[in-house]
UniProtKB/Swiss-Prot annotation:
Pfam family, one: SHMT
Top-rank taxon: Bacteria
Name the record gives this protein: Serine hydroxymethyltransferase
Gene Ontology biological process terms, A to Z: glycine biosynthetic process from serine; tetrahydrofolate interconversion
N6-(pyridoxal phosphate)lysine sites (modified residues): K229
Amino acids binding (6S)-5,6,7,8-tetrahydrofolate: L121, G125, H126, L127, S355, P356, F357
Keywords: Amino-acid biosynthesis, Cytoplasm, One-carbon metabolism, Pyridoxal phosphate, Transferase
Matches recorded under Gene3D superfamilies: Aspartate Aminotransferase, domain 1, Type I PLP-dependent aspartate aminotransferase-like (Major domain)
Necessary cofactors: pyridoxal 5'-phosphate
Subunit structure: Homodimer.
Principal localisation: cytoplasm
One annotated GO molecular function: glycine hydroxymethyltransferase activity
Length: 417
């Protein structure tokens, strides 16, 4: 018999200590990694529920195991909410991650060796959009497109490459691009050569749900996303589509199960259902609007302090600082800010002279700080502190002064009050 009073603290002190230290780190550090966010206690309650015990291979109403009548309700709620939130008529909520969702799309639509047009990782794309170290780059013939001199996606180049290479699929989406993507233009290019348009909206799904960023679902053949990042749910993936192509939907379902995965994680799917409901609330729209405002406010400070922002600004939740002119590496900047309890990630910038392990830039995102209540005044102050650190990167006294300010503002704006 399992007793409800069982706990980790009494049983595994070593593990519990690490968990508690991570909790403190999240409260006492300012999180600016663009792909990170804080999920709600409701989502965590779902993920720590007895749903974790249930195997449910298959889909609602078509399971390979008995006893699925209640998890069917859970999964159907998640499916229906995903479709409603993004205006889709198909949703698969089972992918364990965004990469798994992307893998399923490749598997459903392509054969190994097919040509794919994807955004260059060094110019803002994602590993799963064709990086040679990823399955996408190993199994498919990848043709990369990029950005122009202004830092915007070069649609003329994309159209030219599409016409020349005749890819079977074009991928829209990014991990480090601060502009607005013209999904309709991408579909036009795809249609001109008879290619699929697949959009990975993982980074901007929350903004899209709130109407702050254009929705790709009406334009793409298939859309994927993570359920964390701006959507602020549990770590997981989601596939969406619109257009009524039932054969395509069957292929997508089969590509997730049984092709790529076995049993779905029902406790995570419950967490997704909670997060999708939260994303329909009026306060979620206000939150996402503030995410965009905060990113713009931070960019303004960096520009005024003489820092180069890739593409000159941001139209979403993230932006890149190009530190080449400052003679700093992304690795150095990441480490120095980390010592001041400010967490960012080093990131390659266009035409980066440094390796991906060193880089010449950092990526900054506003979702997590906005989640804890920061508005323009706080993020402007924060951006100023970051400039102080970067201007004096070897001055530990400056870093300690900034760290003290960070600890103070974190205490005033707790993640979990």
């Amino acid at each position: 018999m399992l007793k409800r009073e069982m706990n980790i603290a009494d049983y595994d002190a070593e593990l519990w200590q690490a968990m508690e230290q991570e909790k403190v780190r999240q409260e006492e550090h300012i999180e600016l990694i663009a792909s990170e966010n804080y999920t709600s206690p409701r989502v965590m309650q779902a993920q720590g529920s007895q749903l974790t015990n249930k195997y449910a291979e298959g889909y609602p109403g078509k399971r390979y195991y008995g006893g699925c009548e209640y998890v069917d309700i859970v999964e159907q709620l998640a499916i229906d909410r995903a479709k409603e939130l993004f205006g889709a008529d198909y949703a698969n909520v089972q992918p364990h991650s965004g990469s798994q969702a992307n893998f399923a799309v490749y598997t459903a639509l392509l054969q190994p060796g097919d040509t794919v047009l994807g955004m260059n990782l060094a110019q803002g794309g994602h590993l799963t959009h064709g990086s040679p170290v990823n399955f996408s780059g190993k199994l498919y013939n990848i043709v990369p497109y990029g950005i122009d001199e202004s830092g915007k996606i070069d649609y003329d180049e994309m159209a030219k490459l599409a016409k020349e290479h005749k890819p079977k699929m074009i991928i829209g989406g990014f991990s480090a691009y601060s502009g607005v993507v013209d999904w309709a233009k991408m579909r036009e290019i795809a249609d001109s050569i008879g290619a699929y348009l697949f959009v990975d909206m993982a980074h901007v799904a929350g903004l899209i749900a709130a109407g702050v960023y254009p929705n790709p679902v009406p334009h793409a053949h298939v859309v994927t996303t993570t359920t964390h990042k701006t959507l602020a749910g549990p770590r997981g993936g989601l596939i969406l589509a619109k257009g009524g192509d039932e054969e395509l939907y069957k292929k997508l379902n089969s590509a997730v199960f049984p092709s790529a995965q076995g049993g779905p994680l029902m406790h995570v799917i419950a967490g997704k259902a909670v997060a999708l409901k939260e994303a329909m609330e009026p306060e979620f729209k206000v939150y996402q609007q503030q995410v965009a405002k905060n990113a713009k406010a931070m960019v303004e400070v960096f520009l005024n302090r003489g820092y180069k922002v890739v593409s000159g600004g941001t139209e979403n939740h993230l932006f890149l600082l190009d530190l080449v002119d400052k003679n700093l590496t992304g690795k150095e900047a990441d480490a120095a800010l980390g010592r001041a309890n400010i967490t960012v990630n080093k990131n390659s910038v266009p035409n980066d002279p440094k390796s991906p392990f060193v880089t010449s830039g950092i990526r900054i995102g506003s979702p997590a700080v906005t989640r804890r209540g920061f508005k323009e005044a706080e993020v402007k102050e924060l951006a100023g502190w970051m400039c102080d650190v970067l201007d004096n990167i070897n001055d530990e006294a400056t870093i300690e002064r900034v760290k003290a300010k960070v600890l103070d503002i974190c205490a005033r704006f707790p993640v979990y009050a």
